[in-house]
Amino acid sequence: MTNQKISRDVHHLAHRMSGFQESSRIVPEEAPIAMSYNGTTQAVMMATPGDLEDFAIGFSLTENIVTRIEEIEALDIVAFESGIDIQMKLAKQPEQRLSARRRFMAGQVGCGLCGIDSIEQALRPLHPLEECSTTFTTRDIAAAVASLGAAQALNAKTHATHGAGFFRPGEGLFAVREDIGRHNALDKLIGAVAREGLLAEEGIVAITSRVSVEMVQKAVMLGVPVLAAISAPTALAIRTAEAANLTLVALVRDEEFDIYTHCGRIIEG
């Protein structure tokens, strides 16, 4: 394991109405993070070098490399001058899934579909979420998104990171994760929820970004019934959420928002 700085104070020259002046600003760190399984690098992504164990677990789950945490028998975080290698040892069964869905990604910031070598992999079928009687109020949606923004400590300093949070009605946020990449932030959150053994079907995932199809895929893999976002969804994200029985809420502004799929889970209150 290794502790990595996630932000840095940078001195720079600023231009204001009064002219040029010396200034400083806290900016997020960015580093290449390699996901390696049984001695082979599977993916390399640019990410904020924090909450790396959560990141590795969440990525492994949402990529269907593992189906439960116990299939990762060991996890080591090794820092090099050029980046960080998260080295995982898998049980025997996940190795078959790994070879079937091998992908290599490099150079982009949390690119959710980078390096996938076929359309079938990019739009892989999802098992629809099970029907449940759980409902959430309009206040729950507003509170989930509002509390996420207030809990983003790194973004408060840098104004440069995405956030993802898991919210349970009546209890609040259980986990918040941040990253320069929106996909990375969600993977980190999914890893945190899995590590804590939280019941995903009891809560809402809130995100501070737009909703692309990859964000829907990750939410469905977690098993959460509602995904709520500050920004708008894509048409493909809406179609995917509809098919997967996920309630997709977007453009959340206090208690005003749009519900695109499976509206029955959201009630007035």
UniProtKB/Swiss-Prot annotation:
GO terms for molecular function: sulfur carrier activity; sulfurtransferase activity. It comes from the Bacteria. Keywords: Cytoplasm, Molybdenum cofactor biosynthesis. Gene3D superfamilies: 3.10.20.10, Cytidine Deaminase, domain 2 (3.40.140.10). One of its GO terms (biological process) is Mo-molybdopterin cofactor biosynthetic process. Belongs to the FdhD family. GO terms for cellular component: cytoplasm. It is found in: Cytoplasm. Required for formate dehydrogenase (FDH) activity. Acts as a sulfur carrier protein that transfers sulfur from IscS to the molybdenum cofactor prior to its insertion into FDH. SUPFAM superfamilies: Cytidine deaminase-like. This is Sulfur carrier protein FdhD. The active site is at C111 (cysteine persulfide intermediate).
